[in-house]
Amino acid sequence: MRLSGDLPTFQKSFFRNLVAALVACCVLIKEKNFRLQKGSLPALLLRSVAGTVGIVCNFYAIDHLAVADASILNKLAPFFSIVFSALLLKERASWKDWLLVVIAFSGALFVIKPTFSLSESFPALMGALGGLGAGLAYTCVHYLGGKGERTAMIVFFFSAFSCLSMLPFTIIYFTPMSLPQLAFLLLAGASASVAQFSVTKAYSFAPAKDISVYDYSQVLFSAIWGLAFFTELPDIWSFIGYAVIIGAAIVKFLLSKTKHEKDVGTDELK
């Protein structure tokens, strides 16, 4: 998305979701089933609205803030997801879960090193709203997964909704694109498609408190791509952050594994 240059936020959002909508549509056509699960429409609409607002706010923040600042604000999403899951889905997170998320967030701070200034208050607010929207969207996805809604339908409904809502603004504020810009936007859309299917599948099968820590692995991949495409070599603070994030993820994995083995043992005794 950064390589696509200075294009309107709505235009970037439209192309970002267009590819995902087409891919999900092809999957549904192959399955020959466009039917929604009973009672899933309200959650699909809420997921789509929250996700669309989250994307627009995040892209606005990226365009008006330092990329590092926009990234750290988007990393608020797991916090919001755990809060929404507790409020809306009545999921309980232990103090260990909360502590690990805070530790992972601290690791992200080491990597991103945000530097806010007073003049950037509105874009920063938009970035925080982007994290809130993403967190609510993840919560809705987990709820829909519990109702048996298919991943392809969730991705298609959201992507189509986002494209349709962005289309009028894209037409009004359309900026001509060069072939490289169009190629980068389509490539971003393809990458987003893979990410959407993966994240939707993950949040469909597990609660936010079990997934949120792993969301910070994105920081590691961002560093890899930054080095590959922009020759951005991480400093010592970044490496400290990587160690904190990976450590939190490993501890979370071990805790989840221990809990699962304990639950299985309890079931066998019954």
Listing of model-derived features with the role each one plays in the protein:
Residues R2-G5, T9, A24, F116-M177, ...:
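Transmembrane alpha-helical segments that form core, pore/gating elements
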Residues C25, S48-V56, P78-V83, A108-L109, ...:
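Hydrophobic/small/kink-forming positions within alpha-helical transmembrane segments
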Residues Y60, A77-L99, L220-F239:
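C-terminal transmembrane-helix exit sites in multi-pass transporters
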Residues K96-K113, W237-S256:
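Hydrophobic transmembrane alpha-helices of multi-pass small-molecule transport proteins
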